[in-house]
Amino acid sequence: MFKGFREEYVQVDKGKLFCRIGGEGTPLLLLHGYPQTHVMWYKTAPELAKNFTIIAADLRGYGSSMVLPSDPNHATYSKREMANDMIQLMNKLGYDKFFVAGHDRGGRVAHRLARDHRQRVIAMSVLDICPTLDMYEATDMEFARSYFHWYFLIQPKGLPEKMIESDPRAWVDSCLQKWSGGREFGPAEEAYLAAFSQPERIHASCEDYRAAAGIDLEHDRADRDQLLNIPIQILWGKHGVIGRKFSPIKVWQAYTTEKVSGCAMPTGHFIPEEDPKGVITKLNNFFLSTN
């Protein structure tokens, strides 16, 4: 995995972030989703590195990055704090302006990063998400059944943590299988499981979702009408919820003055691992056209 990439632990204000770096060209920050780590990009990063300097990072609380104590308001794991981490990471690495691509939770961090640090992001690609606020506001029985984990993981007093800790493999495997339509994830799944076998990281991931259901929505409502001015690409899984429940291009177009492009991919939720060649092509075409 990640042949030709170097590993780095980068010191930021509140701890260390883990990332892999490789390639050359305009920086492209890759952010992962749940229940994963930066490893989810292992099929795509080496090819993307032929055109870009790739920085594949673990979000705080995930993978090998820092775990921080939670707080009653869940602000520690807000997307604003996670986005600030990534800005500090890019500062330390010497990158001023950059592209960002985020899947799932990473897409939500990328969106907040682009909103809070408007002069830094050249263009953004988000994979299999619509904005958090839109998704919560559209919640109905169909959505709740498909995204049950959104409502399970936010439960208080450590209940979801205790249940996941009782059998981490069953939880990780069920997420990967259910959301991909039964695909095999090979050695990557072991990397995800290694992180999800640590109680403090299970708790951190729950805090990520608790923040999304609270303080993140406050932030999103506060600047909802402040449009971005960057191109956005949205890729969604043909067999997933996003395309069935939303009109992704239309939803994202309401967030930027620039063009939104994108399409459905022949996948479930885990697009970069289910269709790596397609993702490589789409990301290359999009970012190279805006460079």
Model-predicted regions and their roles:
Residues 39-42, 46, 84, 111, ...:
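Surface-exposed alpha-helical interface segments used for non-catalytic interactions
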Residues 199-200, 276, 290-291:
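Alpha/beta-hydrolase-fold serine-hydrolase catalytic core, especially in secreted/extracellular enzymes
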Residues 20-68:
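Conserved HGGG/HGGXW glycine-rich cap/lid loop of the alpha/beta-hydrolase fold
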Residues 35, 50, 118-119, 257-258, ...:
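Proline-centered flexible-loop/turn and helix-kink motifs
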Residues 268-276, 280:
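Catalytic histidine-centered segment of alpha/beta-hydrolase-like enzymes
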Residues 282-290:
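C-terminal alpha-helix
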Residues 1-8, 14-17, 27, 55, ...:
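Flexible "cap/lid" subdomain of the alpha/beta-hydrolase fold that forms the substrate-access gate
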Residues 184-185, 289-291:
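Conserved donor-nucleotide binding/catalytic region of nucleotide-linked donor-dependent transferases
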